[in-house]
Amino acid sequence: MNRTTAALVTAGAVSALVIPGLSPAAAGGHHGPSYDEPRVVTALDGPRGVDALGHGRTLVTESDGSFSMVVERRHGPAKVIGLGALATDFPPAVALGRHGTVFLLTGASSGPPEDARAASVLTADEVEPEPAAGATLYRWRPGWDAPRPFADIGAYQVGDPDPADLEDLPADSNPFGLAALADGSVLVADAAGNDLLRVDKHGDITTVARLLPRVVEVPEGLPELPPEAGGPLPPAGTPIPSEAVATSVTVGPDGAWYVGELRGFPATPGTSQVWRIKPGTVGATCDPEAPWTGRCTRYADGLTSVVDLAAGSRGVYALELSKQSWFATELGLPGSEIGGLYLIGKHRHGTRLHELATDRLLTPGGVDVVGRDVYVTGPLFGPGALLRVG
């Protein structure tokens, strides 16, 4: 696993998602009203995956690999109904497909060698669960004992290497983002493969689009690092190529497919893009040097470390792991735990970013929208929550 995608698994732990009393700060280059402080729907443990189904029902995943249905009640606290689990050390992505099928996506991280948590609750007649395979799309249906493997994303990427890879790992795979389509197929954003894949209802995989690297400048304010920690870093302002790192995918209100980028090292703030891809596309290229041509065109720019996308009637929403960047979080820089949530609205001939819940989210992991309600999960490690914004 390369350095950038490893950061998605090892982002620093924090203890709360809502920051009490923190004054909103102006976000440079971003405009629009800030929504009210998020409301806690229910406490969760290191949540990430979220699929808001409407009528107060939301699918979520947590750090132990479990997936549950959160049911909001008019009078009383929300109820969390466990549905199943994958033995993994990072919460999978989740999406509800047709006929009650739940899709779950594991990344490059798989189950821990020794699952002390599971072993501690096993009885003499029980068998410790096998670690879930990494880089795999699973599906689960009501009545099934456990999720079943459906598509081996990692194996597919071995035969479909990234031609623009910058880290000598062209066959690397870390599927991270997931969206279920109405025809029974599934879209998968592979962070290490820098591409968007489509898995059809039979489990066959095709490459929808490849996201090419972008030349960025090394940001100011990075500390000096010793060689054993990856240093020395290039001087600020040095232009270097940086991989896209496709983390997220959603279907927009216009039916188009939208893909979000984390941005590889040095994770320069403001260089993450959102791409718009025409439905049914195969073999497209998302090229920052020619962003307005072909079947993949740039929809938004100026974001930082995007980890999830969602769509509603008002447009596409982008969730940032950190407004300073994932690399700043990895370095432990002050304030780097603060994430961002933006509604990407149309503005003249382009788009405009409207921030929601300004400075109220810490290392968030997932976002989804139903009606006018925006649901956010996080932080990725430690005590967290499912939140509702709007």
Where are these regions (language model features)?
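Asp-box/WD-like beta-propeller blade repeats and closely related beta-sheet repeat scaffolds
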Residues: A87-A93, S109-P175
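Beta-propeller domains
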Residues: L59-V80
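Residue-level signature of beta-propeller blades and closely related beta-rich strand-turn architectures
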Residues: D64, A108-S110, A192, R263, ...
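Secretory targeting and sorting signals
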Residues: M1-G28
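Short, conserved, GDST-rich strand-edge loop motifs in beta-rich repeat architectures
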Residues: L104-G134, P219-E220, Y258-Q273, L319-I338, ...
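Beta-rich, blade/repeat-based domains predominating
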Residues: V41-R57, L86-T101, T106-A108, Q157-V186, ...
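A short loop-to-beta-strand structural motif that recurs across blades of beta-propeller domains
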Residues: S66-M69, A133-Y138, D195-R198, T207, ...
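Blade-edge beta-strand/turn elements of extracellular beta-propeller
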Residues: G32-T42, H75-A87, G143-L169, H202-S242, ...
